[in-house]
């Protein structure tokens, strides 16, 4: 019985690999929205953040005993008035079995006006997505390698249409207290739509990524690098805002080079004073910057920044993410050490 849970997770993960490609549009893309302030400030996809109870939502291999009785709640004031939230918790079962991690992700798209084919308003409706996850990681004996997996139960509702799905994350992570670097490989959101909105099942938006971090020796700076979307080389989609029109009215699409497309796979983050009670974080998401830039204006899209402040058993994080000149995102996180008494 001691290995039942890890084996169950592995079986579900392999099942989702086999059924990941079904056809149709990709769904449940809300799983790729960063819901923690640490994640958002570091560019939106840092995979090597250590001892952070929110991190296993992105990389289950980072689950560790140091997360025991740690909890976090997160809120994102997302684009266009969309509200995003999540909560996470970890508990050490025992030193032999290891630590279990649980998480909830939620997104509320707000209310929309319903209308018939003639444009006559018939009322309003809402749209919401929910994911509930449970995860586990295992330290490979006599090594500094960790393997982990999440199982996610997914639910979505758009007006009267509902959908349920099952997805999983699989990761491997190298970390040593005696090395300034760490690295990881993760496959996220492999899954299967159990109940479609209508008759045809659709694909879940999965991602294959690798990441690394490096803590500088004489300067209190830690670097994070992520290379994502390895399952799809071509990420370049011409931005209509950057097309050119000549005097004859002919429109020329934005030209995207090999280097431009390659850099869209990269996310860079940096932490200042990463091991102190107060720290600063900055990030740059190359794909976000390329897709949201405007030819006639400096948008600063792709940039993000934030800070963390720890006081006793509590820690507060904030992140600001730049998307567009008219819309930005703020992320708030509160961590609580439930094992610590008093303030």
Question: What does each of the following model-derived ranges do?
Answer:
Residues 1-4, 143:
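Positively charged n-region of N-terminal signal peptides that target proteins for export
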Residues 4-15:
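Sec-dependent N-terminal signal peptides
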Residues 21-343:
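Subset of outer-membrane beta-barrel
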């Amino acid at each position: 019985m001691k290995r039942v849970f890890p084996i169950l997770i592995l079986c579900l993960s392999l099942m989702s690999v086999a059924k990941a490609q079904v056809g149709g549009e990709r769904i449940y893309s809300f799983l790729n929205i960063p819901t923690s302030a640490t994640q958002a400030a570091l560019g939106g996809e840092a995979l090597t953040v250590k001892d952070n109870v929110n991190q296993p939502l992105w990389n289950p291999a980072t689950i560790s005993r140091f997360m025991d009785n740690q909890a976090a709640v997160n809120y994102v004031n997302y684009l266009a008035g969309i509200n995003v939230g999540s909560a996470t918790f970890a508990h050490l079962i025992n030193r032999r079995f290891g630590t279990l991690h649980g998480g909830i992700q939620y997104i509320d798209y707000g209310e929309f006006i319903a209308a018939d084919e003639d444009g006559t308003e018939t009322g309003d409706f809402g749209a919401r997505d929910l994911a509930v996850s449970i995860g586990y990681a295992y330290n490979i004996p006599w090594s500094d390698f960790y393997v982990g997996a999440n199982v996610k139960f997914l639910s979505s509702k758009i007006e009267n249409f509902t959908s349920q799905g099952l997805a999983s994350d699989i990761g491997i992570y190298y970390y040593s207290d005696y090395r300034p670097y760490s690295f990881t490989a993760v496959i996220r959101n492999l899954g299967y739509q159990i109940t479609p909105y209508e008759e045809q099942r659709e694909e879940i938006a999965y991602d294959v990524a690798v990441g690394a971090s490096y803590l500088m020796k004489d300067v209190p700076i830690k670097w994070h690098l992520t290379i994502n979307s390895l399952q799809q080389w071509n990420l370049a989609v011409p931005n209509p805002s950057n097309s050119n029109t000549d005097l004859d009215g002919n429109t020329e699409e934005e030209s995207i080079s090999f280097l431009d497309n390659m850099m869209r796979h990269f996310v860079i983050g940096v932490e200042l004073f990463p091991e102190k009670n107060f720290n600063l974080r900055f990030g740059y998401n190359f794909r976000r910057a390329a897709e949201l830039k405007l030819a006639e204006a400096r948008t600063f899209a792709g940039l993000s920044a934030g800070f963390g402040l720890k006081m006793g058993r509590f820690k507060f994080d904030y992140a600001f993410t730049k998307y567009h000149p008219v819309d930005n995102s703020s992320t708030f996180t509160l961590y609580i050490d439930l094992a610590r008494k008093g303030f």
